[in-house]
UniProtKB/Swiss-Prot annotation:
It comes from the Eukaryota. The keyword Nucleus does not apply. The lineage of its organism: Eukaryota, Metazoa, Ecdysozoa, Nematoda, Chromadorea. The gene is mks-5. Belongs to the RPGRIP1 family. It is found in: Cell projection, Cilium. Residues 108-119, 1015-1029 have a biased composition (Polar residues). This is Protein fantom. GO terms for cellular component: ciliary basal body; ciliary transition zone. It comes from Caenorhabditis elegans. Residues 984-996, 1068-1080 have a biased composition (Basic and acidic residues). Residues 224-234, 956-975, 1042-1067 have a biased composition (Acidic residues).
Length: 1322
């Protein structure tokens, strides 16, 4: 049965931490938002409460009587002023009134002094001719204003213009009359001058007669001038009533002065000179009046022009919209009124016509009825004589009887309004109306019998009136129905308009959502591209070579997860245990499993549980600190009591000898007393070797760590990557292949987890290819460079074939040193792994200086190597019985108890010794776990002693030792290794001698020490796994040292097993010979190279050759050897490179000749960084700022808000990176012009910094800052990626985001680089 659990192992710790931080950040944001909303709610509540209290206080406020009286008086005064203003407006707009605007605008009075000789004239009446007044116009205007006040408001300006034109015309007429009068007076003056005598010596009679004549003439002239002055006074009085009041007393004074000489009975004698003077005075007065009238006329003209200009340019103010709407309503009501009147007239006309027709029909029926009655009387006498006559009379009666009355609609020509109304009405509605009216008329049909019963004409008239009233009611219903339908139509029109507006709004919103979704899709595509690159990286990291062996079985790629089954086989309880019991199994994060309750006796079990184990960092940590916990419980009445506990370790699954299954037994001791409670035999099996799953997991971890590779189109920071330049110059020796000269070739290189790079196919040997690979600055990169290689393939362009001709594999270790590079001409190998005549000229060099973390400091003294990520779990220190791991075949179950070896007495000997360490734990394995993919610096092999009486075990041991290779890994002594080094002749005697030299001296060999004392010598050396053998409880096992000792030791040591010295020496020589033969075979017959896509990028060990079947000892037990990670060679990237041997001289690399293709900028000195470059200029121009629809910054538009723009550019100070202050937009979607330009002149250091910014795609960020009294607040921010092609003065629109990442505004700016700066950057 498979236990259910949560997939915790699928979640890495960074993912869990990221998820936790995201959740915490969202929680903080939500709390901030809740606090802000609570503040807003509190503010709204306080405002609402304040407004309610103010309204309540205003309602409950008691006004004093005196204040109320004062307000009433003020209202009355205002009403009086309003009436006066209306009266003045009516006087001003009346046609007979004189425009007062002239005098008001000029600021002077139009009052003039009339001449003293003029006399007062009564005011002109309505019938007087020559007056400008039109008395009948005022009542008509008042009537019109009373009848349609709203229409008067619409046409008051036009009427004022018309009245001013009329007044101007009248004034022109007055001017012409006055001119005519002046001309007449001039003629009289000239005639008087001609008729006056030359001498004044005349008789009294002549003087009297002349004086009387002159007086009479003067009186006539005075009367004419008086009439003219009164006429002008009348005009001025009508135009300015206020001035007229002022003129009245002066007129009285003139009258009195004029009448005083008339009261004198005897007038004074006049002389001709006085008459002439009077005429001249009158003439001057008339001229003055004329000039004043002309000035008034000019003023009236100017006022008229102003009014016309104002009426044309005046906008709709002072309720113009309301007046226009009221005018429209008035016009609509007038149209409805006219239509209603027309309908009433038409209905009256139809009623009269119907009444006439019905009267004619009634008379016709009455006459017919009378004639039929008379005929019936005549025929009644003859009816008795003949039956035939009676029938004939009846027929005549029937024939002469009038037909039944049926209503036929009167067909007439409809009016235009009826036709239009009928077109608008529905056909169904008209048909229904026709049927109802027809039914009413049919119900009022009159027969002959009913006509006889009719009385006087009053009854008939009442009946027709009733019929008309019913028809009228039906028509009213139809009219109301049409009105209701009209209202419904209007409402539907309004709804359609609202829906249309909503549709436009939704279109705008959908366009915004579409733009946002498009951006999200682009971001998602970028993420997909990144994931594809990561998948490709993982895929290339797990490639395996295709081995050209016919009998090799294709083993599928191991999975990261495997099925772990635990089977309990047999239980043997102690005699002291008498109660029933059961076991519980707990492993990792899986569900707790329990066995059935069993009796206290020895018996076999058949209990199996299966765990689906997924390899992860958490599982590795668990295996290092824990195992499968088995607890023994005793059931009670209402609870369970813990009796004993133990822990099963899974470290045997990581051994080379155990592939998929092993069985052992464990002792469970009491948790209270430590007494043994039972012995449990178990079996553990996995679906596939768990070591393969760990290898796969480690490879995926390595690939995941190498994921941050810089892509071609990716914008990443240069500070996290260091470029490595790979240049392939030429291929030497192509002509030796004997190929056609037209054959095309190309070079393919495979480097780490990067995609294979193909050069262009060409027939020339000159390749001239260059490639930059960006290496992440992480620790795993250094490890990969120390243990990996780069592969080059010469490929021929052959259709449907791989076309691989030659290969070359170079280790990357020389690149890890200071100034390290790989350059020169290297010979290539053919497909069979033999040297060829083709060489490849190439160069691998860092673009900049080698990264500092690549440099590995050499320790002066050998120190213990500390691994980064231990993969094998540490031993678990738990009290349990020693056990023996027994190999079990796939189809076989072992139920028998494990057998123990007989103890051996210790004997002193000089042979190589080994010691077994005794531990009370269930897992006595390596004290320090090693990384599967981090091989030790000096890998060593360890031999375990076997009984001398069993030669089969000796052979098996020898075969196991043959699988191991001993060689030194002096990485620092080799700069570059060519593939030719793999064909060097091996020296069989050097490897064992080298190994013997590297073995510790007798003085340095660790001695056995007391188990209670710490083993100090073991701390500086690597610990090796040691097996446990099953022994009896009474046997004692002494600790032994896993390391090899020299043949001759100065002090004897106790050992578990003893052998003769001759046997030991023979065995040692045999082991050395086997190691030498294995090394020769590995160096001599190397596997060929497959096509490029199958060449591995991940580590490949030399020990991955098909292993021979290991023989099992006679005891049926497995002997543990080296841990898994010791079998991995130092170089994991190539299966063709031979082990590096320190005794051989390194292969010298020739210097690369030719021009360098890498452009490296020289480093700047501290003095050069501050040198100013006058041609290197960058200008930043801020153009416009605009709020987007629905922005949360809209409330700031109602305030007088000012703000400025701040940005960060290179290393300029904050004062040099801010704009001037400008105003905030006054309404949404209003564009504010900033028009601010900032120009920078760069130094050499700033130029280098700008180049780094552009290469790393660092964003140019801007911040919008609001200026508040005493404080500044950030409203939003935007960013722009710098590119070296900003010379075209392009305007960029930057979205301004708030803290929540929502777009609030848009800002337009221009970024311009000078031409010299562009040339320097590119």
């Amino acid at each position: 049965m498979v236990s259910a659990r949560y997939p915790i192992e699928k979640w890495s710790r960074p993912q869990l931490e990221d998820h936790f931080h995201n959740v915490v950040e969202e929680l903080n944001k939500a709390q901030k938002k809740v606090k802000e909303q609570e503040k807003q709610i509190t503010t709204f509540n306080s405002r609402f409460r304040r407004s309610m209290l103010e309204r309540k206080s205003q309602n409950e406020k008691v006004v004093e009587r005196s204040k109320y009286d004062d307000v009433v008086k003020e209202n009355q005064i205002l009403d009086m002023k309003l009436k006066a203003a209306k009266q003045q407006l009516l006087i001003y707009t009346a046609p007979s009134a004189r425009a007062t605007t002239a005098s008001m605008m000029t600021g002077r009075s139009t009052f003039r002094q009339p001449p003293s000789t003029f006399r007062q004239r009564p005011p002109l009446t309505a019938g007087t001719t020559g007056s400008i007044d039109r008395p009948g116009s005022a009542p008509v205007a008042r009537k019109k204003s009373d009848g349609g006040e709203k229409l008067q408001l619409a046409t008051d300006e036009k009427l004022a213009i018309v009245r001013l034109n009329r007044t101007l015309k009248n004034k022109n007429d007055e001017i012409t009359e006055l001119k005519y009068t002046i001309e007449k007076l001039r003629q009289l003056k000239s005639s008087v001058n001609q008729s006056s005598p030359p001498t004044r010596l005349s008789t009294s009679s002549s003087s009297k007669s002349s004086s009387s004549n002159n007086n009479n003439d003067g009186e006539g002239k005075d009367s004419e001038l008086e009439e003219m002055s009164e006429m002008s006074d009348d005009e001025s009085g009508r135009s300015t009533p206020v001035i007229e009041e002022k003129k009245k007393p002066r007129r009285k004074s003139r009258k009195s002065s004029h009448q005083e000489p008339s009261k004198n009975p005897i007038p004074p004698p006049r002389i001709p000179d006085q008459t002439e003077k009077v005429l001249l005075d009158k003439l001057k007065v008339a001229e003055n009046d004329l000039a004043m009238l002309q000035e008034e006329c000019d003023l009236v003209k100017k006022a008229n022009e102003r009014l016309v200009h104002q009426s044309l340019s005046k906008s709709t103010e002072y309720g113009a919209r309301e007046s226009i709407e009221e005018k429209k309503k008035i016009v609509e009501l007038e149209e409805l009124l006219k239509e209603t009147e027309k309908r009433i007239k038409e209905s009256e006309h139809r009623r009269r016509e119907d009444q006439k027709k019905f009267e004619a029909m009634r008379l016709h029926y009455k006459n017919k009825y009378d004639a039929a009655k008379k005929t019936e009387k005549k025929l009644s006498v003859v009816a008795k004589n003949s039956k035939v006559e009676e029938e004939r009379i009846e027929e005549e009666k029937i024939s002469h009887s009038p037909p039944p009355m049926t209503f036929e609609p009167i067909r007439k020509r409809h009016s235009q309004s009826e036709i239009s109304r009928m077109r608008r009405a529905d056909d169904d509605l008209l048909q229904k109306l026709y049927k109802e009216v027809a039914d009413i008329l049919h119900s009022h049909d009159v027969g002959i019998a009913e006509i006889n019963t009719l009385g006087a004409s009053e009854n008939s008239l009442a009946r027709w009136q009733k019929l008309y009233s019913e028809l009228y009611e039906e028509l009213e219903k139809v009219r109301n129905m049409l009105l209701i339908q009209y209202d419904i139509n209007q409402k539907q029109m309004k709804e359609i308009k609202l829906l249309k507006d909503e549709l436009d709004r939704l279109k705008t919103v959908s366009a915004e959502i579409l733009s946002k979704s498009r951006e999200e899709v682009e971001e998602r595509q970028k993420k997909i591209f990144m994931l594809e690159e990561q998948i490709r990286t993982i895929a290339y990291s797990g490639q395996q070579p295709v081995k050209l062996l016919a009998n090799q079985i294709n083993i599928p790629t191991p999975r990261v997860n495997t099925d772990l089954s635990v089977k309990l086989i047999n239980v043997k309880p102690s005699p002291s245990l008498t109660s029933k019991f059961f076991f519980s199994l707990e492993f990792f994060d899986f569900q707790l499993e329990t066995t059935p309750i069993m009796d206290a006796k020895q018996h076999n079990m058949d209990f199996t549980t299966v765990y689906d184990v997924l390899v992860s960092n958490l599982l590795i940590h668990y295996l290092q600190t824990n195992g499968i916990v088995i607890e023994m419980y005793r059931p009670a009445s209402d609870c369970y009591k813990l009796l004993a506990a133990a822990t099963i370790s899974l470290i045997p699954l990581f051994e080379d000898s155990v592939l998929r299954k092993f069985c052992s037994e464990i002792m469970l001791k009491s948790v209270d007393t430590g007494v043994e409670m039972c012995t449990l035999r178990y079996e553990i099996e996995v679906s596939q070797p768990i070591s393969d799953s760990f290898k796969k997991f480690k490879k995926s971890e390595m690939a995941r760590n190498m994921l941050p590779l810089q892509l071609e189109n990716e914008d990443t920071e240069d500070t996290n990557f260091d470029p490595l330049t790979i240049m392939v110059n030429r291929v030497v020796g192509l002509d030796t292949f004997g190929k056609d000269p037209s054959t095309e070739f190309c070079i393919v290189d495979e480097f780490l987890s990067f995609s294979p790079y193909f050069t262009d196919f060409s027939t020339s040997s000159e390749i001239r290819s260059k490639r930059d690979c960006y290496i992440p600055k992480i620790d795993i990169a250094r490890n990969l460079f120390a243990t990996s290689s780069i592969s080059f393939f010469l490929i021929e362009n052959i259709p449907r074939q791989d076309g691989v001709i030659a290969t070359l594999h170079l280790p990357l270790h020389p690149l890890c040193k200071l100034g390290g590079s790989i350059k020169g001409t290297f010979p290539m190998l053919d497909t069979d792994g033999r040297p060829s005549s083709v060489s490849l000229d190439l160069c691998l060099i860092w673009k900049h200086e080698i990264p500092s973390f690549f440099l590995k400091h050499e320790p002066k003294e050998p120190l213990k190597e500390v691994k980064d990520t231990p993969i094998l779990p540490q031993p678990v220190r738990r009290t349990s019985k020693e056990f023996v791991v027994t190999p079990v075949k796939e189809a076989e179950l072992h139920d028998a108890e494990p057998t123990s070896m007989p103890p051996k007495a210790p004997e002193p000997t000089t042979a190589p010794l080994r010691r077994l360490s005794t531990d009370s734990s269930d897992t006595s394995f390596s004290h320090s776990s090693k990384d599967l993919f981090s091989p030790p610096t000096n890998p060593q092999t360890y031999d375990y002693e076997i009984p001398a009486v069993t030669p089969a075990l000796v052979d098996s041991d020898g075969e196991e030792e043959a699988d191991r290779i001993v060689f030194d890994d002096d990485d620092d002594e080799i700069e570059s290794v060519s593939a030719v080094s793999s064909q060097r002749d091996p020296e069989p005697l050097e490897v064992p001698e080298r190994q013997v030299e590297n073995l510790p001296s007798p003085e340095d060999t660790p001695r056995p020490s007391d188990p209670l004392k710490p083993n100090g010598t073991n701390e500086s050396k690597e610990s090796t796994p040691v097996t446990q053998r099953s022994v009896d409880k009474t046997d004692d096992v002494a600790p032994v040292d896993p390391e090899l000792e020299p043949e001759s030791g100065p002090e004897p040591e106790p050992v578990v097993e003893s052998e003769p010295n001759e046997v030991a020496e023979t065995e040692e020589d045999r082991k050395r010979e086997l190691k030498t033969e294995e090394l020769k075979s590995l160096l001599g017959a190397l596997p060929p190279i497959a096509k490029p896509r199958n060449i591995p990028v991940g580590p490949i060990a030399l020990t991955e050759q098909p292993e021979a079947t290991r023989q099992q000892g006679s005891t049926g037990r497995i002997l543990f050897t080296d841990p898994l990670h010791f079998s991995v060679p130092p170089s994991e990237s190539s299966s063709t490179s031979s082990p590096r041997r320190a005794e051989k001289a390194p292969v010298p690399l020739p210097d690369y000749e030719g021009h360098s293709l890498i452009k490296v900028r020289k480093p700047l000195s501290p003095t050069d960084k501050d040198v100013l470059e006058p041609n290197m200029k960058v200008s930043i121009q801020l153009e416009t700022f605009e709020l987007v629809p629905g922005s949360s910054l809209t409330p700031l538009t109602r305030e007088e808000t000012t703000f400025f723009v701040d940005w960060v550019f290179l290393d300029f100070t904050n004062e040099q990176s801010k704009s001037t202050i400008f105003d905030f937009p006054r309404r949404p979607q209003e564009m504010v012009d900033i028009r601010y330009t900032k120009e920078y002149t760069l130094t050499r250091g700033q130029l280098s910094l700008l180049d780094q910014w552009i290469r790393a795609s660092i964003k140019f960020e801007l911040t919008i800052i609001k200026i508040s009294p005493g404080d500044e607040e950030e409203l939003g921010f935007g960013s722009l990626i710098l590119v070296p092609n900003n010379t075209q003065n392009k305007s960029f629109v930057i979205d301004v985001y708030d803290r929540s990442g929502i777009v609030q505004a848009e800002m337009t700016l221009t970024l311009h680089f000078s031409r010299a700066l562009i040339e320097q950057l590119t």
